[in-house]
């Protein structure tokens, strides 16, 4: 069976991706700083195979260990989903009030972490002549969302990184794409996010709140053989908000 690594896979969107991939026949490596036991148990209870791996994606040592663990346990690394992000701890405010420490932390996780995870899996994917990297960005990149410029800028960087890697890794048989969701309410969101969601829903033709499961079809498409000739792309999943 093919193997997929999902960073930030213990809860939220990452956990949804893990369950969907397991249901589609993937062996799943749940990578997170949080406890991965519940996610692994849920996958195994449904008949899938999974392991957990405590990982700080901003650490090269951790990401290299993650890749080695995945390959050692399941034999191949076929898909990497870079989902882990620094977001829920951010307090919205004017751009000039963002602390340097918070700016740096956001980039350490969202940008450096994504790059390090790609670096870690690359030797395995190159050796096997195939692989799929799926990076998670955000529609805030296109709207210039006010209040957290460091997060928006970090996610915009992900799209640039995706295009660079798609061009460089294509000859090795590796595709690299980005998926950009809109605001997706989850237990970690703040009251201000709930208010924002009301405005987001009003902007889109599909008049409802986006849920994590809305991402599954796109993720499985990019992880599967049907997308073998698709690379360097950013797929926006937001209920058509940008068509108005």
What is the predicted function of each stretch?
Residues 87, 92, 143, 198, ...:
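Short C-terminal tail/terminal secondary-structure segment
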Residues 115, 130, 209-237, 242:
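C-terminal substrate-recognition "lid" of short-chain dehydrogenase/reductases
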Residues 118, 154, 162:
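Active-site helix of classical SDR
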Residues 123, 167-171, 228:
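Alpha-helical segment proximal to the catalytic Tyr-Lys
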Residues 138:
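Residue(s) in the substrate-gating loop at a strand-loop-helix junction
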């Amino acid at each position: 069976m093919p193997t997929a690594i999902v960073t930030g896979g213990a809860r939220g969107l990452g956990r949804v991706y893990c369950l969907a991939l397991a249901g589609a026949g993937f062996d799943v490596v749940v990578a997170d700083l949080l406890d991965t036991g519940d996610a692994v148990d849920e996958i195994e209870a449904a008949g899938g195979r999974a392991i957990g791996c405590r990982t700080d994606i901003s650490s090269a040592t951790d990401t290299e260990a993650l890749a080695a663990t995945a390959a050692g346990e399941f034999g191949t690394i076929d898909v990497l989903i870079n989902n882990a992000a620094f977001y829920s701890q951010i307090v919205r405010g004017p751009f000039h009030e963002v602390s340097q420490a918070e700016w740096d932390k956001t980039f350490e996780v969202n940008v450096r972490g994504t790059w390090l995870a790609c670096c870690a899996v690359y030797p395995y994917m190159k050796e096997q002549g195939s692989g799929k990297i799926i990076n998670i960005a955000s529609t805030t990149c296109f709207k210039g969302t006010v209040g957290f410029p460091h997060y928006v800028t970090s996610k915009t960087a992900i799209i640039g990184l995706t295009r660079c890697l798609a061009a460089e890794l294509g000859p090795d048989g590796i595709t690299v794409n980005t998926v950009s969701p809109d605001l997706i309410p989850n237990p970690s969101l703040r009251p201000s996010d709930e208010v924002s969601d009301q405005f987001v829903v009003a902007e889109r033709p599909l008049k409802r709140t986006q849920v994590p499961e809305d991402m599954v079809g796109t993720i499985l498409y990019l992880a599967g053989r049907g997308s073998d000739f698709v690379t360097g792309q950013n797929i926006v999943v937001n209920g058509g908000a940008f068509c108005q």
